[in-house]
């Protein structure tokens, strides 16, 4: 079952959505095929097996068609029928959530059917809702442009006097729509493609001119188009990470109006703030660890942590580790309990055990931490290196210096390979392993150098795990009256 479109679609919807799908399938407006209803009933009875993809096509066919001989073409038609209904259900969901799209569509129907009274009544209603809208993002300008276009296309006695004003507003909204499309696209792509934001100034048509326009009209945009202004600030901190004041300005705006933002806009803003905060943290700005924690909590409080029905393995562990580094162990444990079950199946066991190992280590339960680490597979570069860091820290606390040598050697070889993590994050790991090697040597054969090691670490620019290394080197140096 795992190879068919139906399985992929089922995995993409929540249990609540699956249950809601029943009403959609039973409605004769959307479905008149009784075999599709039978298929849905079978999947509902065997929901867990369906989610795992462990149901065979023969089992499915037998339930729907009884003892009839299996027919491959009939089976594919059956599963395709339910897949198409799920597609329609998802589109219907989207349609139901977009009130502006619905009203614009109805306005277009009134226009083409030539019912001016209904057109004018609805037009005024739409206008009032646009005027009071807080979330003036990409879809807002798209829908309002469409609205003005329809008004201008249907000139009647009621709106002829507004023609010039509406024309001007339509082109202003078109400009904002183009600006939002441009800077939103650049913002999203830059989260995945290193260096893209700076290349965009040269390679993306009109991007540089848009930045020039927004800079020149900053105060006007800030007052009249606050969402555009926030997206502009996001671009500015990506272009120049040193401009921290813009990050904190966005944060203040979120704090003041958090309940007003739509889920999609809030998610986009938070993801970009998170990306910025992480980059600041791994490049040596320790204060941004608290910002990462703040963003993760806001994501959780607004039910934005999950992407669809899952949480990414790397993000899951990073939340736990960043919280642990701040000493927020209780919240980290709550996070593990709340979201561990949503890890992708490939990452679930390793992700949970790596996270639990981190928490156990912070609680000085080194035996439990090591027991969890045994169950971790090195699924990607971040997991592999984080796993090695925790192993070394646990072995050091247990004075297992023989095991330390083996881990250090494998980590050293691994870092010499070309691995797909940012140069900044890689540098953090390199520094940790280098200083850990010195710490181990000091602890075993050169205790007299502990004071020098502590001073050397103290003079370093901040890097991840530096505090732990400082603490351990200080413990070695204490007998020498540091």
Question: Which residues fall in each region the model found?
Answer:
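Residue-level signature for tetratricopeptide repeat
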Residues: 235-237, 276-282, 318-325, 359, ...
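Generic helix N-cap/helix-start motif at coil->alpha-helix transitions
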Residues: 1, 222-230, 264-277, 307-317, ...
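Amphipathic alpha-helical repeat scaffolds
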Residues: 7-10, 107, 317-321, 354, ...
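Solenoid-like repeat scaffolds
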Residues: 27-29, 130-132, 216-223, 254-266, ...
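Helix-turn-helix repeat elements of alpha-solenoid scaffolds
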Residues: 119, 199-212, 240-253, 283-297, ...
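C-terminal structural cap/anchor segments
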Residues: 350-425
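C-terminal non-catalytic interaction modules
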Residues: 3-19, 23, 27-31, 80, ...
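Flexible inter-repeat linkers and adjacent short helices
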Residues: 1-226, 230-236, 469, 478-482
